[in-house]
């Protein structure tokens, strides 16, 4: 089964996640099919906390990909910034 989940990156005590489409059998940080964006839980000030390609996200959902609970919650509350909306 294909899933949409967070792949951890960053340094020790400084998490940074990529939102990826991957086969469920792959490891959390292993090979993935497509990168849909990122999530920075420690974003401060003007830093972007979440960037997500909603067109690609919705396309994968239509194809049958299952989002994780955390990704589903992030996508539900996602509002693109003005830069992303005009691009």
Swiss-Prot record:
Task: From the UniProt annotation, give the residues forming the signal peptide.
Answer: none
InterPro entries, from UniProt? Ribosomal_bS16, Ribosomal_bS16_CS, Ribosomal_bS16_dom_sf
One GO cellular component, as annotated: cytoplasm
A GO biological-process term:
translation
One MF term in the entry's GO annotations: structural constituent of ribosome
Q: Which UniProt keywords apply?
A: Ribonucleoprotein, Ribosomal protein
Gene3D superfamilies per the record?
Answer: 3.30.1320.10
UniProt lists the family membership as follows: Belongs to the bacterial ribosomal protein bS16 family.
The protein's name: Small ribosomal subunit protein bS16
Q: Which gene encodes it?
A: rpsP
